[in-house]
Amino acid sequence: MTIIYSPEFNSTSYINLEQRQGQLLGLKVCGSTELLSELELRTGIIALEQSEPERLVAFHESLSKNVKGTIFEESFKTDEVGVARQLMVWTDNLLMAGWTPDTKVDSDKLMVLAKIVKGVVGKHVAQRWQDLTTYLKSHTIFQKDDVIEVHTEELIPAVIKSTLEQLAHQATVNYVVHEGQIPTDFKVFHFKTRDNAYQWYLSQPDAINNVDVTISSDNCILNDMAIAMGKPTVNSKSQNSNPQLLQLFKLGLSLFARPLNVNHLLSYLLIPGNPVGGVSYKLAKVLAKEGGVNEEWQKVIDEFDFTETNEKGEKKDKRQERLQFLMMMKKDYYAEGILVSDIRTYTENLAHWCDKQLRSPFTDDERKEQLVVLASFCRSLLLILPADGNISSELLQNHVDGIYRPQTFTHMKAQKGAPDVVSSITQLVDKAEKVCWLGCIGDSSAVYPFDFLNTKEIEKLQQSGITIPSKSVFYSKQHQMLLESLKNVHQLVLVTWEFDSNARQEEHPLITELKHQHHDDWGKRVINDEKPNLPIKKGNIIKLDPQTTYQLSDKMTSLKRENESYSSITTMIQHPFDYAVNYLLKLHEPQIGQLPDLDTTKGLVAHRFVELLVKKYGEQMAEDYDRIPQEQKSNLMADAIQQKGAVLLLPEYKLECQQFKSILDDSVSVLADIIQKLQLKPLDSEVEMNVNLDVIGEFKAEVDLVLRNPKGEYVIFDFKWSEGKTYPNKLEENKSIQLELYKEALKLHYGAGSKIAGVAYYLFPKMTLFTVDFPESDHIHHIEQKEENGKRVLLDEINNSYVYRRNELNKGMIEESEMTEISEIAYTKADTADDPLFPLEPDYNHDTLKGCPYVKVDKPPFVKKDGWKKNPTTNEIQANPEVIKEIKTTHPILKGRLV
């Protein structure tokens, strides 16, 4: 039996079978953990392996009992779990160095740590090594011809050294010292980006032919690219990974805090396979649309069918089981903090859900790894939480952050034909003729583990027989280990890159050292941006330019919406292709993963605030507004924000929210004054009108505010959160399809004889009413239309244009004609005095051409801003394709073919 040991080795370390004459049987490569398990197995010593969260809980329990009156007391009050974790790391390093709680050292810090360690329930790994050493003094577990081959002796912790010394009495323990020097036969292949380097490597260039082993520390992206290129994958692990499943722990518990973090709620609902079940997607969709939790949220829950079929084929109602993971949404924790019992209930349910998933035959191995960790997080929190009472959101967050840690999970396994890959140069057990170091960047040295000790404490420990290396000695040993490992290599190929995801990478110390040693011929050894060894396919690229017309299938010609809206009518007239794709085929770009932007959110909140005011105060809203107590206003505004703009409650928007509330209060006060000045009474807000228009047919209008004057005539106000000129310009040019159709809808909604006194846009940020129907006054801007605009009968134009486009659709043809001279388009030529059509909008870059949607292009990496143009010339594009900032496209959903 031969055991090969180094703290740096693991089961995937490189062994040269030819050098060892094929003696794989009876050979075992071990790191410290594997060696401990092997020795305990041979001795029959049974030691319960504690997970990291379990060890943390035990340490926290001992610390909480012993922290009073110590130097750690105040910091422990601030962050119990975080401090416990840090002190646990310190004691781990001390214990492995040979320190014990009984070591006599005149240091307050070390005496406190000793007291804490004595109170920890469970056996530390250092104690397990010490127990082994004691056992080996009187027991033999190896035969004389067994060999233990030890590498990197300088890095072996003291407690393990003691065990190895004892093993030397019953087996052959050889300490390997590498002969030779670091390789002089090397090349450096330098690339701009990691992707370029990986593509070159996977293309199997001549430079890496006959490579014995590849060193690569992060193979996840490498494997993704290998799959894309049809190459076999290698063993890979997601290092320091935060998979979505583990986020259930952090995100779920963050939902108990108030104000509610709506971004966290959206992320929680979008985690695949989350415990909320199928309703989560629908809730995420309504949350993204509404901007907060309101009656639409509850409507989804009430109407959702929670019936599920179990493994036996039985159907069961899972409503209660699923909704228990949203129980915090119905609680208000503002006043007295969060009930510990609620936290416990949620955490216990989440742990129980993990257990059920682990028992399911449909759960794959990768997910099981994550479920085990998630369950351990939950149970650790349950042990740390108080038995009952309340807990603040800050303390809960500290507990969660202290317990949660990124993990390492299996990503992919090596496939047949994959190269031999190790994660570090220190994992070369034997000599290798040719090695490729893929990703020789940055400084991967271990962090000095004794930074918490001062010089005097180190000296006192050494006087007690415990060797603590100084920082300089520690890093010197690390560097020496690197050089020793390189002696195993004859020919070396180093692959480096300058950027990884736009982040500039540091130079590896080895590159720095080699550059210094070989400065005379360094230029000959470095190859920059080597082209990948890929076959070149030649062919004509067919560019899909915007078309003049499109043919529709027979099925599409019969498609018709249940009801139209002003936005669908506008799209049909201006961009019939978009209408067909968006409204008939219902193909939209996915937007469920994001909440509305800030300006849209403010508009939603403003609408809801006015709606709540009208609902509460009715016709007296305008007269009463300035007399409403500030507390009542604040409560109504808070409700509006919670229901429609919860993102404003996030800490990062605190100042923005304060400014917004002030502007909204002032703006609604101005709106109330305008209503009184015009002698109007609010009738209703957010009025849904489903009517049948003469030409268009079924039509749905959502009117922001309907008012009435003393004559009983109706007035429409439409609210906008905008500071631009778009809406005033629509009125000036007599192009407001929205207000024109709303007038017709209102007449039908309120019955025959209904008269319209006027319509207007109210822009909240500008605190101004824009109208053509009411006279100029404070905060009322009367817009004068040019004579030719005022003479146009807008409703006739809209109806005629609708009929024109509908006839096109019925015939199976769409005339898009984007970026075509407007005067040459058939639609324009059909515009006559007898049958006027609504005018087409020109492109914002070209006044005479019909408008076209644009796709915004992200600035490519490494392209300077001044070289990135919005409207480059044809010559500029041919010279440098990267200068394009926007691309014209028939429809945004087709942008995948363009960018």
Predicted regions and their residues:
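Conserved motor-region signature of P-loop NTPase helicases/translocases
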Residues: 2-29, 143-259, 431, 898
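ATPase/helicase motor core of nucleic-acid motors
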Residues: 17-28, 38, 43-44, 205-329, ...
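RecB-family 4Fe-4S metal-dependent nuclease core
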Residues: 543-899
